[in-house]
């Protein structure tokens, strides 16, 4: 062959191969369509698939038409039932770590809020950490002066338990410098107190929407629990204080359903002082262990019935659990009156276990450092000094702070009793350390059927931050 014939032959062969390739593709597509259209055992391409995601608030409905997806979003209905919360507390032999947020350590380089007063509360699906922000971030100029309790910048926000109070995962709840929150089984209810000291207002949110308000009745810093409120069979209960922090004030119990106040009662407690109650459900009642900021180093106890009748007194145990306090050996205990003659105080908690009590307290008698929980035999009903168990949570070389109670509902645990849990705030910065800010992180513990070793789950942040050196 001459060169021209070779070129023509090669070109013809190439065109033939291309034509054959096209025919093979057409045959392949035709066979595929015929097989899929006649495959009665295959998936229904014309059907509807429902996928429900617990982590969202919607149902995803996907209608499939061959390779075309039409996606519709329909609102997920709210939970059908209220939580009962009438079960007894589980007996706890010790307390195991549930979560630790390490917010201040992370906040040295991360976008973490300056906070105080963190607390935990649970729904049938999850537990959340609530906290009062200062409208500023750690290691930022706006953190200056955040030792102040009340300002127009403070808000109640929340994250899933264990997460740091960071900008990216936090959910806004209410404008507040004092707050409480709880879940009735259907929706979250929050109570946020804000406004001027003499005319503060508490706004009740239900499902994220403002539903009701409580105006200051005594004109002296209306305030509430700084820990979880308590819902029983759809009714939610919490305690509020209005009046002086260092002498007789006024106290009220509130009851709400779906965020609307349906009842309230005054607590008659002449000579006693109630603030910042830590409450939990137990056998159909609400049991609260509170703070006496006037004179007592023993803690007030308030037990609330569904009809808003109540009993009020003091934790009977012969061991004091407030701070500051005197020596254990010099304390006698009383079920009815304040003892100790020590002003000031700190938010704390206790759990009734039959006639016994688990009670938390700082290890230091004079400052907010260290934390331990002790079990006192017959301490709920008698002036007992019989300390039968102790577990250290934060050693006395490290700062602690407020502490409070909550329970794990049976819907979460599948138990026949409510698991007692508590959190400990670990305050860092002013007034004890050389910084321009005050903030905190927290450790959360829950009751278990076994003894748990003492350790120190302290905050661990290295101070000062860069902003403190400027």
UniProtKB/Swiss-Prot annotation:
<feature type="disulfide bond">
    <location>
        <begin position="122"/>
        <end position="127"/>
    </location>
</feature>
<protein>
    <recommendedName>
        <fullName>Neuraminidase</fullName>
        <ecNumber>3.2.1.18</ecNumber>
    </recommendedName>
</protein>
<dbReference type="GO" id="GO:0046761">
    <property type="term" value="P:viral budding from plasma membrane"/>
</dbReference>
<feature type="active site" description="Nucleophile">
    <location>
        <position position="402"/>
    </location>
</feature>
<keyword id="KW-0946">Virion</keyword>
<feature type="disulfide bond">
    <location>
        <begin position="182"/>
        <end position="229"/>
    </location>
</feature>
<feature type="disulfide bond">
    <location>
        <begin position="316"/>
        <end position="335"/>
    </location>
</feature>
<feature type="binding site">
    <location>
        <position position="368"/>
    </location>
    <ligand>
        <name>substrate</name>
    </ligand>
</feature>
<feature type="glycosylation site" description="N-linked (GlcNAc...) asparagine; by host">
    <location>
        <position position="293"/>
    </location>
</feature>
<keyword id="KW-1043">Host membrane</keyword>
<feature type="binding site">
    <location>
        <position position="322"/>
    </location>
    <ligand>
        <name>Ca(2+)</name>
    </ligand>
</feature>
<feature type="disulfide bond">
    <location>
        <begin position="421"/>
        <end position="446"/>
    </location>
</feature>
<keyword id="KW-0812">Transmembrane</keyword>
<feature type="region of interest" description="Hypervariable stalk region">
    <location>
        <begin position="32"/>
        <end position="86"/>
    </location>
</feature>
<feature type="binding site">
    <location>
        <position position="116"/>
    </location>
    <ligand>
        <name>substrate</name>
    </ligand>
</feature>
<feature type="binding site">
    <location>
        <position position="291"/>
    </location>
    <ligand>
        <name>substrate</name>
    </ligand>
</feature>
<keyword id="KW-0479">Metal-binding</keyword>
<feature type="glycosylation site" description="N-linked (GlcNAc...) asparagine; by host">
    <location>
        <position position="39"/>
    </location>
</feature>
<keyword id="KW-0326">Glycosidase</keyword>
<dbReference type="GO" id="GO:0016020">
    <property type="term" value="C:membrane"/>
</dbReference>
<feature type="topological domain" description="Intravirion">
    <location>
        <begin position="1"/>
        <end position="14"/>
    </location>
</feature>
<feature type="binding site">
    <location>
        <position position="292"/>
    </location>
    <ligand>
        <name>Ca(2+)</name>
    </ligand>
</feature>
<feature type="disulfide bond">
    <location>
        <begin position="231"/>
        <end position="236"/>
    </location>
</feature>
<keyword id="KW-0106">Calcium</keyword>
<feature type="binding site">
    <location>
        <begin position="275"/>
        <end position="276"/>
    </location>
    <ligand>
        <name>substrate</name>
    </ligand>
</feature>
<keyword id="KW-0325">Glycoprotein</keyword>
<keyword id="KW-1015">Disulfide bond</keyword>
<comment type="subunit">
    <text>Homotetramer.</text>
</comment>
<dbReference type="GO" id="GO:0004308">
    <property type="term" value="F:exo-alpha-sialidase activity"/>
</dbReference>
<feature type="disulfide bond">
    <location>
        <begin position="279"/>
        <end position="288"/>
    </location>
</feature>
<feature type="glycosylation site" description="N-linked (GlcNAc...) asparagine; by host">
    <location>
        <position position="54"/>
    </location>
</feature>
<comment type="function">
    <text>Catalyzes the removal of terminal sialic acid residues from viral and cellular glycoconjugates. Cleaves off the terminal sialic acids on the glycosylated HA during virus budding to facilitate virus release. Additionally helps virus spread through the circulation by further removing sialic acids from the cell surface. These cleavages prevent self-aggregation and ensure the efficient spread of the progeny virus from cell to cell. Otherwise, infection would be limited to one round of replication.</text>
</comment>
<feature type="region of interest" description="Head of neuraminidase">
    <location>
        <begin position="89"/>
        <end position="470"/>
    </location>
</feature>
<keyword id="KW-1032">Host cell membrane</keyword>
<feature type="topological domain" description="Virion surface">
    <location>
        <begin position="36"/>
        <end position="470"/>
    </location>
</feature>
<keyword id="KW-0378">Hydrolase</keyword>
<keyword id="KW-1133">Transmembrane helix</keyword>
<feature type="active site" description="Proton donor/acceptor">
    <location>
        <position position="149"/>
    </location>
</feature>
<feature type="glycosylation site" description="N-linked (GlcNAc...) asparagine; by host">
    <location>
        <position position="144"/>
    </location>
</feature>
<comment type="similarity">
    <text>Belongs to the glycosyl hydrolase 34 family.</text>
</comment>
<feature type="binding site">
    <location>
        <position position="150"/>
    </location>
    <ligand>
        <name>substrate</name>
    </ligand>
</feature>
<feature type="binding site">
    <location>
        <position position="296"/>
    </location>
    <ligand>
        <name>Ca(2+)</name>
    </ligand>
</feature>
């Amino acid at each position: 062959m001459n060169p021209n014939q070779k070129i023509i032959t090669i070109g013809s062969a190439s065109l033939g191969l291309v034509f054959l390739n096209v025919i093979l593709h057409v045959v392949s597509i035709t066979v595929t369509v015929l097989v899929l259209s006649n495959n009665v055992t295959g998936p229904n391409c014309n059907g509807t698939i429902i996928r429900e995601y617990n982590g969202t608030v919607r149902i995803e409905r996907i209608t499939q038409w061959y390779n075309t997806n039409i996606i519709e979003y329909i609102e997920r209905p709210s939970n059908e039932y209220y939580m009962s919360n009438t079960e007894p507390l589980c007996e706890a032999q010790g307390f195991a770590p549930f979560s630790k947020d390490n917010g201040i350590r992370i906040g040295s380089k991360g976008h973490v809020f300056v906070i105080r007063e963190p607390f935990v509360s649970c729904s049938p699906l999850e537990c959340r950490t609530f906290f009062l922000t200062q409208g500023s971030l750690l290691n930022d100029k706006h953190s200056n002066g955040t030792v102040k309790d009340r300002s127009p910048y403070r808000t109640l926000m929340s994250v899933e338990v264990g997460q740091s109070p960071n900008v990216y995962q936090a959910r806004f709840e209410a404008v507040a410098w004092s707050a409480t929150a709880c879940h009735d089984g259907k929706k979250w209810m929050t109570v946020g107190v804000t406004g001027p000291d003499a005319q503060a207002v508490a706004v009740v949110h239900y499902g994220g929407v403002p539903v009701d308000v409580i105006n200051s009745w005594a004109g002296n810093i209306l305030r509430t629990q700084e820990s979880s409120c308590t819902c029983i069979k759809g009714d939610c209960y919490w305690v509020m204080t209005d009046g002086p922090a260092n002498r007789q004030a006024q106290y009220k119990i509130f009851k709400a359903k779906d965020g609307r106040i349906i009842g309230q009662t005054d607590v008659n407690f002449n000579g006693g002082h109630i603030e910042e109650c830590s409450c939990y459900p137990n056998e159909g009642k609400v049991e609260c262990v509170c703070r006496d900021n006037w004179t007592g180093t023993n803690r007030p106890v308030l037990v609330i019935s569904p009809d808003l009748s109540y009993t009020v007194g003091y934790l009977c145990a012969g061991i004091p659990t407030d701070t500051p306090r005197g020596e254990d050996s010099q304390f006698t205990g009383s079920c009815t009156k304040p003892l100790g003659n020590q002003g000031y105080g700190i938010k704390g908690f206790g759990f009734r276990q039959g006639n016994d009590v688990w009670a938390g307290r700082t290890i230091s008698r004079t400052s907010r450092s260290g934390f331990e929980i002790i079990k006192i035999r017959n301490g709920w009903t008698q002036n007992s000094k019989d300390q039968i168990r102790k577990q250290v949570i934060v050693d006395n070389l490290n700062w602690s702070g407020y502490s409070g109670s909550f329970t794990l509902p049976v819907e979460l645990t599948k138990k026949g009793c409510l698991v007692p849990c508590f959190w400990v705030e670990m305050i860092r910065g002013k007034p004890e350390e050389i910084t321009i800010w005050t903030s905190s992180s927290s450790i959360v513990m829950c009751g278990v059927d076994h003894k748990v070793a003492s350790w120190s789950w302290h905050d661990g942040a290295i101070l000062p931050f860069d902003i403190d050196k400027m």
